Structures are given as C-alpha cells and as structure tokens.
Amino acid sequence: MVQRCLVVALLVVVVAAALCSAQLNFTPNWGTGKRDAADFGDPYSFLYRLIQAEARKMSGCSN
C-alpha cells in the first residue's frame, strides 16, 4: 500500500514537472520586437465596419 502511494506520488510529480517545464531567456537588447501594435488596428476597424453593415441589413429585413 505504501509502495503504491509512493509510485502514485512520483507519477504526479513527474507529470506536473512535464506540464510546467518552460524556458525563459532574457536579454536587455530585446528592442521593440518584430510586430508593431499599429498593425492590428486596421483589421479590427474592418471587422467593426463589417458588423455594422450586416446589422443595418438585418434591421432592414425585420420590417
């Protein structure tokens, strides 16, 4: 019984370690990165206009 509990506890520790493994690299020279936040504004505005147009179409059909 004790041996079974130890095996289960060891298995839980191994699975937890496998799920939590990660690598962290830090460098002071990261800079601004590869992406610019301004690039994401255009698709969102397009989707907003598309949703507005579809809502107008649907409100016209309800009459």
UniProtKB/Swiss-Prot annotation:
GO terms for biological process: flight behavior; neuropeptide signaling pathway. It is found in: Secreted. PROSITE patterns: AKH. It comes from the Eukaryota. This hormone, released from cells in the corpora cardiaca, causes release of diglycerides from the fat body and stimulation of muscles to use these diglycerides as an energy source during energy-demanding processes. Belongs to the AKH/HRTH/RPCH family. Adipokinetic hormone precursor-related peptide (APRP) can form three type of disulfide-bond dimers: p1 (alpha-alpha), p2 (alpha-beta), and p3 (beta-beta). This is Adipokinetic prohormone type 1. It comes from Schistocerca gregaria (Desert locust).
